[in-house]
Amino acid sequence: MNNSVTRLLFKRLLTLQLCHHFDIIPHRDQSFDCVQMQQPQNETANNFIPSIQLLWSTDPPQIRPDGTYPQAVELFPCFKDKWNTKEEILNIILAANADPKSNCVTVQSSPRPCSSSQFIYPRLDNAWYKNDGYIWKKRTNGKQNREDHLNLKISGHPHISAKYIHSAIVPTFHRRSYSVPDSDCHVLVHYLNVKTNNKIDDQAEEIARSMIENKVFISLSQLHDQLSPIFLQTLNVNQLVAEINEHLKKKGVNLPTSPLPQEPSSSTSRELERRNSCSSAFRKGLSSVALRRQPSANSEIDANHIGTMLKRFGCNGSSSDRISIIQPTMQNFQSIRSHQNHVAMESRSPSGDGDSRPITFEEDASYQQLSIKSSTNVSTPASAFAEKMKIRSGSQESPMGPPSSSSVTSTSLIPIIEMTPSSSSLKGGQKMLVVGGYYRKGHEYKISFGRGRMMPAVLIHAGVLSCVIPPSAKPEVVQIRVFCNGQAISTASEFTYEPQSAHLIKENDDTLVQIFEKIRIMACAFNAYSSIENIQSSSCMESLLANIVQQIDNEVSSQNLNYKTELLNGSAHFPSKTVLHLVASLDYDRLFEALIDLSRKVPACREFDIFARDNDGSTPLHTACKNSASRIARLIISIDSSAIDVVDDRGRTPVEVAPEHSIDMLSDKNNEEERVNATELWVMTNGKAFTTDKILDGKISRAPIAEKPDDLLREATSSYSIMSEMYEGPMLQAGTSRECDEDCESCCDPDSTQQLHVEIAMDTDVHVPDSPKMARLFHAVTSPGIVVPPNARARMADLARQIIEALPDRIKRNSEVSMCPDEEDPGQNHHGGVEPMFYQQASCSMSTDSPNMMDDYFDMMATETRNDIFTEPRSTETTETSASKSAQLFATHCNFFDDRSFASSSTRANTFESDTLDFDKDLGEFFTIHVDRFVDPIQQRLANLKYNDDEQRDVYEAAMVIQRAYRVYRARSTTRRQEDIERRAALKIQGCYRRYKQFCYFKKLHNAAIVVQKHFRMRKRDDKEEGAVEAVIASVPEHPTLDGQSICIQVPKTNSTMLRERAATTIQVAYRYRHRKRQAAARKIQNFMRQNRNNVNIDDGHTQHLIAENACAKRRRYVACPQTSGDQRNKRDSDGERKRDAHHDAPEFIPIGATPSSTTIPHRPTQRHHPWDQLKPPYGCGTLA
């Protein structure tokens, strides 16, 4: 009684649960044999229990003691000519999960399964079953198969994950894979050709169209192998292939009759080319069997392998030999499956569809890779499950097919023959070479250093990989492996991270002690010594030192304390390493940031100056690059990008002192085509180096300690602004890069922007590259097909405005007269918004690249008067007053511009690049300068670069076109004709701008030569002890001498092999002669100028004159001053006696005929320090920056 009640309750509960979750309606063609089962004890992960039991044709429907099954038993059909319903799919997968030992579960994949066949595969560790030998549609990148992912819902809940893939040859042939996400143990795979068109001609035309669209061009034999399993029972495959070939020939595609070499059945020839270069590695989405070959080896493919295999079990493709497959009969299916399992080769391959989980190192170590060495056309998929069991059992045999099939041998992974170096320090950064069986390029190689450290590798030679050794946190021995396209292809090799040597540890400890001492001195200078009390130098770490600096910063901010400058600036005569140098050597980025934050409250402090130099002339960036401190290097470059162009005493930039491949951003900077040359940098800055006023902003430049007179400050700012504009390189910002506007994103991308190469006709062999900002601007306004963003238009209009203001008035008047003919058409008076200056005669001279620019622009604008919102009345004044009217008209239109875009000519900060050129001064000089061609070679080059009147008129007209375009672009949509005219005008302005930059270059070169010559004369005067001052000056040669020969600054003529760098090198050699170290020379010049600052009396018999050295104007002059007695000077100076003693130490400045005891020392009228006194070595005049 109890047993019957229990069985009845179980039936009702099971029925209610199945009906609640999904309504199971058995189809008419399904047969269910009901047997009495035990009550299930376990349920699946999604609380479902299978409603059927899957049995193979040879399995009797009996109860197994090791499994729990429902009450229904179903024979799993291997072939089904329609898609399964969602309920059927769920039942099949759950039944397979409940009984994984069932014979319905297949552990071997079949090559090119026939249409209507379905399989149940175990997932194992990857989607290995997807390598079935068919050619499927690819993604847009052409590398991976395209899969459509869907979630099938049952009763409103997504319980089935489906993946659909479509054939690239037969558009009606598909493969569908189903799995249950909550219980991802088995997968149901179904192949089906949903449309069977019996007309061969229509089917052939459809297949030919699909092959052309998917770019599948294979041989006729391979096409026959692809179509045979799909149209096994419906069409004559031989006739179908012939029809397809005819359709392809009509469309201009000829398929090869012989099989393409090195082409497996599961991929095209292009895929195999990429595939074979991996040696024994397999690429995602390609065949599971790796083709291992040497560079000189060629593998041929047997095109008839599949045909031979099909003939063995009766599938030869002919209509007379077709096999009639009957659905209830299972013996034929079993024989086909057994034969497929027999000929399948063992291998393991991950799926290339992107849905497989990554392979761990342990799994890769437990598997081996098979390769084909003989001539085989088909890389048949293999049984991953059987291979896994075989390899774990230690067996080395591979089940083979008939002797006529391919010969397959099992080999291990590619061994690493040698690697150098085999050990490294904890810092890493060295280049390592790995030698092995890696031959061809075009693949993504990576080398793993233990777990979680993958470094990209480059194939620099056949069999040689190169990568950078990553840093390590502790000394250890790690396993190194080579990966190709994400798959391990080599055996493991040991690599050792060695601990630091004793002397390196000692050096680091000494550096830490020095940093602590520096911070202690800083605390004393800021009267914040309480922050470092009870702290020992032996316990200093980066975090502790950073906290100390932050405490000092907080105390300075809260109390606003005065600090002692002498403790922070150190000695100017003996430059040493600053705290930034020491921190950069250890790569303490947190401490470096804390010091930079503190420097914002301490202006003009050498300890916090990123341009400060040590005794070798190295900046903190040099030190960071030498020690591979990448974090500090990125931080310094983000603060001020010009630090990468500073050179040390040996003329080396930070890029040149950095180890190879240690810092990527510096290597990229070094590999640029247009890079700063150390000699050119020194010449362009007149031997000066400048730091920044606001370190974190890095925008406003200033001289180091430039005080009055204002001329020196103006000259220094102008010189540095030229350098910052001309040589500002694209740095690699670490998370601080400035984003462009949405409209300008495409044209302002530093990765996609390239410099425009527009030929400029000029008589010079000097090329000054565009800065990145100007290159991006010109690229945005001159490239066809790119929408010009508003900010680029504003900047271009600003440049055009400055050019117009710099041009002489006579050029403007002549251009206005030429653009305003006397006899005008009365109908043209009503062209709204077109100024008189835009009219142009046909005889107006225009450049060859912009003919009739103004006429085209006027015609174009006249047709768009309806959209023009700028209506200006026609000028009725005479041609004599046209200049004033034009200025008024220009000022009227300038009111429309934004305040940020336009400013007065005297406001430099509001220009489109605040740190670029001094356009107001230099452009006017460029257009109006009068040079003598017979003075010297540099003057000749300046004369050649100067624009003549006709060229200046062309530039003026182009600038007016840009001005007009900017005023009206917001109110109308630009046309193609308008864009062409604006582009030609922008090219004209670009040529003018580039020639102007070359003009500035030669001008600075000339000024640098003058500076060197003047300094040489100063030194020559000090060495002369006899003769009057006039005689001394007269005796100084015009040019410095080297080895008894006069050195003259010369620039080669056109077509000469000597370039500008040799001229600058000549300047350096002349200046640095007889001085090994630059600091010593700078100190001597400073002492000389400091001593000559005091006035010296010279008695010429009548009056007394004073000779004063004016370092700013770089010239000597005589200044008459009233005679002052020594007693009066002593009364005004309480410390006169000490000053007289100090001046007696410089006998070379005592006039001839006077004695030290009788010479009266002049009094310094003011306490204002001369600007040269504040220049620290190597910032002296004429030093090499």
From Swiss-Prot:
InterPro entries: Ankyrin_rpt-contain_sf (IPR036770), CG-1_dom (IPR005559), Ig-like_fold (IPR013783), Ig_E-set (IPR014756), IQ_motif_EF-hand-BS (IPR000048), P-loop_NTPase (IPR027417). Residues 393-411 have a biased composition (Low complexity). Keywords: Activator, ANK repeat, Nucleus, Transcription, Transcription regulation. Residues 418-498 form the IPT/TIG domain. The keyword Nucleotide-binding does not apply. Residues 957-984 form the IQ domain. Residues 1128-1147 have a biased composition (Basic and acidic residues). Disulfide bonds: none annotated. May interact with calmodulin. Transcription factor. Positively modulates neuronal levels of the ubiquitous Ca2+ sensor calmodulin/cmd-1, probably by direct binding to the cmd-1 promoter, thereby regulating Ca2+ signaling, physiology, and behavior. PANTHER family: CALMODULIN-BINDING TRANSCRIPTION ACTIVATOR CAMTA, CALMODULIN-BINDING TRANSCRIPTION ACTIVATOR, ISOFORM F. Belongs to the CAMTA family. May negatively modulate calmodulin/cmd-1 expression via a negative feedback loop in which the IQ domains bind to calmodulin. This is Calmodulin-binding transcription activator homolog 1.
